[in-house]
């Protein structure tokens, strides 16, 4: 459970997380040592104590326990138990819903962030070209997926890529009727529709790209659908 605390009274954010991950904050952030807090493993999966009791102690030690505190209530890893615990431990604080607050701030990218996203765009373009060149009737879907992964991670001669937040989504045939399936070990068939939803990633900055392919002869229904989409665009 790794999170950040941003306070108007502090020059830097505060990182907190599991003890074994504390050094990751030292290696990958600019934070000073006094802004990195790592809790011990007895907080993990313990019904008698919770990591946010530790977080409450951090806020108390920094004089933030009586402030207005906005929490990201729709974050994937900020559970109802986290919210209940922090409210119980900080009775003098005022809690507000900070839904999407950080995302709104991060909409405006720095020049460096834009550079990273452009590099991710080159990586995903290469990965998509690999998929286009390799997908064919009789080719196994899993072999294409392996080549796509290689392109995503190997990146370019100048810089490499990283794992993406989600696996390549590349269903074929009837499986395209639901968008979030990926490959199987079956081979591509004549007439298959193939959805490709890929991503390039450079230093955790993503650039997604989606394309649709038809193998062999498309049915009239698919042709009509394509014409309608083109007209709409």
Which residues make up each language-model segment?
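Active-site neighborhoods and metal-handling regions in enzymes and metal-associated proteins
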Residues: 1-233
């Amino acid at each position: 459970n790794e999170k950040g605390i941003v306070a108007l009274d502090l020059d830097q954010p505060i990182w907190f997380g599991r003890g074994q991950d504390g050094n990751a904050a030292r290696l990958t952030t600019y934070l000073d040592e006094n802004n990195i807090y790592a809790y011990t493993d007895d907080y993990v999966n313990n019904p008698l104590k919770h990591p946010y009791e530790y977080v409450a102690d951090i806020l108390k030690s920094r004089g933030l326990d009586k402030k207005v505190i906005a929490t990201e209530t729709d974050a994937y890893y900020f559970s109802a138990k986290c919210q209940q615990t922090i409210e119980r431990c900080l009775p003098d604080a005022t809690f507000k819903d900070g839904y999407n607050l950080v995302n709104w701030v991060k909409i405006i990218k720095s020049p460096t962030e834009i550079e990273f996203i452009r590099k991710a765009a080159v990586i995903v373009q290469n990965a998509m070209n690999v998929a286009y060149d390799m997908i064919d009737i009789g080719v196994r879907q899993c072999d294409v997926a392996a080549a796509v992964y290689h392109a995503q991670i190997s990146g370019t001669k100048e810089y490499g890529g990283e794992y993406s937040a989600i696996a390549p989504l590349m269903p074929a045939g009837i499986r395209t009727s639901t968008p979030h399936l990926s490959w199987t070990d079956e081979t591509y068939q004549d007439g298959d529709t193939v959805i490709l939803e890929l991503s390039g990633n450079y230093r955790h900055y993503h650039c997604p790209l989606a394309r649709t392919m038809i193998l062999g002869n498309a049915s009239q229904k698919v042709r009509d659908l394509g014409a309608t989409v083109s007209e709409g665009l």
